[in-house]
Curated annotation (Swiss-Prot):
Entry similarity comment: Belongs to the universal ribosomal protein uS5 family.
Superkingdom of origin organism: Bacteria
Gene Ontology MF, one: structural constituent of ribosome
Subunit structure, interactors included: Part of the 30S ribosomal subunit. Contacts proteins S4 and S8.
Organism: Anaeromyxobacter sp. (strain Fw109-5)
Residue intervals of the S5 DRBM domain: 12-75
Stated role: With S4 and S12 plays an important role in translational accuracy.
Gene, per the UniProt record: rpsE
Any one of the GO BP annotations: translation
Pfam families according to UniProt: Ribosomal_S5 (PF00333), Ribosomal_S5_C (PF03719)
A GO CC term assigned to this protein in UniProt: small ribosomal subunit
InterPro entries: Ribosomal_Su5_D2-typ_SF, Ribosomal_uS5, Ribosomal_uS5_bac-type, Ribosomal_uS5_C, Ribosomal_uS5_N, Ribosomal_uS5_N_CS, Ribsml_uS5_D2-typ_fold_subgr
Gene3D superfamilies xrefs: 3.30.160.20, 3.30.230.10
Record remark on domains: The N-terminal domain interacts with the head of the 30S subunit; the C-terminal domain interacts with the body and contacts protein S4. The interaction surface between S4 and S5 is involved in control of translational fidelity.
Full protein name: Small ribosomal subunit protein uS5
Length: 168
């Protein structure tokens, strides 16, 4: 099992991706509550996502940030991009992430962009298909990032040295 990541040791920036207002109809009218999708990252390979729910927006954002800090994980980076192409699925949505050359920038929609920038990825190409719901896109992006493997990890899994693997 991997060692847990201590959020207090990292300088995390948080970004609100989506705020949703939900109405519950009661005898006296409507009761509103809010949910907030929050992404936190240190811009250097660590990122986490969380969903907070509360009766007030600031409280929902705080709860989402706290949950995101509990869900931190490390993304392998190669310079300012990702090591290889990867596909992330969640529900009916999927996100394709492709490494890009220096100077390309983050070619992504708002939800995917927030996660990639929080992780410190500066050059990447993406494509979202299927569900465009922010919850599904966010979780599909995270699923894709969790599937990434560095060249060292791939070589170790095959019992070889990183230089022995083919490719770029």
């Amino acid at each position: 099992m991997a060692t847990p990541i201590n959020a207090n040791e990292l300088e995390l920036q948080d970004k609100v991706v989506h705020i949703n207002r939900v109405a519950k109809v009661v005898k006296g009218g409507r009761r509103f509550s809010f949910s907030a999708l929050v992404v936190v990252g240190d811009g250097n390979g660590y990122v986490g996502v969380g969903l907070g729910k509360a009766n007030e927006v600031p409280e929902a954002i705080r709860k989402g940030g706290d949950q995101a800090k509990k869900n931190l994980f490390k993304v392998p980076l190669v310079g300012t991009t990702i090591p290889h192409e990867v596909l992330g699925h969640f529900g009916a949505g999927w996100v394709l992430l492709k490494p890009a050359g220096e100077g390309t920038g983050v070619i992504a929609g708002g939800t995917v962009r927030a996660v990639l920038e929080a992780a410190g990825i500066r050059n990447v190409l993406t494509k979202c298909q299927g569900s465009r719901n922010p919850h599904n896109v966010l979780k599909a992006t995270v699923a894709g990032l969790k599937r990434l493997r560095s060249a060292d990890d791939a070589a170790r899994a095959r019992g070889k040295q990183a230089g022995e693997l083919g490719g770029a």
